[in-house]
Curated annotation (Swiss-Prot):
Signal peptide: none annotated. Part of the 50S ribosomal subunit. Contacts protein L29, and trigger factor when it is bound to the ribosome. GO terms for cellular component: ribonucleoprotein complex; ribosome. This is Large ribosomal subunit protein uL23.
Length: 237
């Protein structure tokens, strides 16, 4: 069996990380199921260059897996090797690159060459200031703009405001349209006609009700008289 086919992949779990907190650190690898402990030791020495203190092997049996179909599946059979290292020795299993601790230099710091030039030069102080400004990359500020005093500006503005006169807008009454006037006259006429018709109808109904009531009263009186006459005839007999 080739040594390269013994250590397949590392196992990275919380339990493994917890075992790596102490002085004696333990690492777990998925191993070829046909490999023995001696094979695992040799493979580890060739890959990492460290002799392990102890090697223990475990067999992880297949378990049922519920997949997308209704029939459950099974996981693969795996053989694990727990390798313990001597005290004070550790390895990087993940293969991650170490973090960079170098910080970028500040922009305001001077370069070493410019500082030496400033110290060595025996010229006037103006040249020294120029070299320092170029090293710091400072842009010179613009010259201040000369402005007139505030009092004179305020007087000018006040004069201009007095001279300017704002004319108020005059309200213009809009002429009424003849169509609207005609519509209003029609509506008033219709209202008057409807009121007159309603009054005539109410008077007619009142008269009819009075005549009907008088006719009913006459009928009732006539029936009463006939009844009295018949009763008198019966008594005489």
């Amino acid at each position: 069996m080739d040594v390269t086919n013994v250590l397949l992949k590392p196992v990275l779990t919380e339990k493994v990380y917890f075992n790596q907190m102490g002085e004696t650190k333990k690492y777990v690898f998925v191993v070829n199921p046909k490999a023995s402990k001696t094979r695992v030791k040799l493979a580890f020495e060739l890959v990492y260059g460290i002799k392990p203190l102890k090697v223990n092997t475990l067999i992880r049996k297949p378990t049922t897996i519920r997949g997308g179909s209704r029939f459950p599946g099974l996981s693969k059979l795996e053989k694990l090797a727990v390798i313990t290292l001597p005290k004070g020795i550790a390895i990087s299993v993940t293969g991650e690159a170490p973090e960079k601790t170098d910080k970028p230099a500040d922009k305001t710091t001077l370069k070493e060459s410019t500082v030496k030039e400033i110290k060595d030069t025996k010229n006037s102080p103006e040249a020294v200031v120029k070299t320092a400004v170029e090293a710091l990359q400072i842009k010179p500020t613009a010259a201040p703009v000369t402005t007139a005093p505030l009092q004179t500006v305020a007087v000018k503005v006040a004069k201009e405001v007095k001279e300017v006169k704002v004319e108020k807008p005059v309200k213009v009454e809009k002429p009424t349209k003849p169509a609207k006037v005609a519509k209003e006259a029609k509506t008033t006429k219709v209202a008057k006609e409807t009121k007159a018709e309603k009054s005539v109808q109410t008077t007619k109904v009142a008269k009819e009700t009075k005549t009907e009531k008088s006719a009913k009263t006459t009928k009732t009186t006539a029936t009463k008289t006939t009844k009295t006459k018949t009763t008198k005839k019966e008594v005489k007999k």
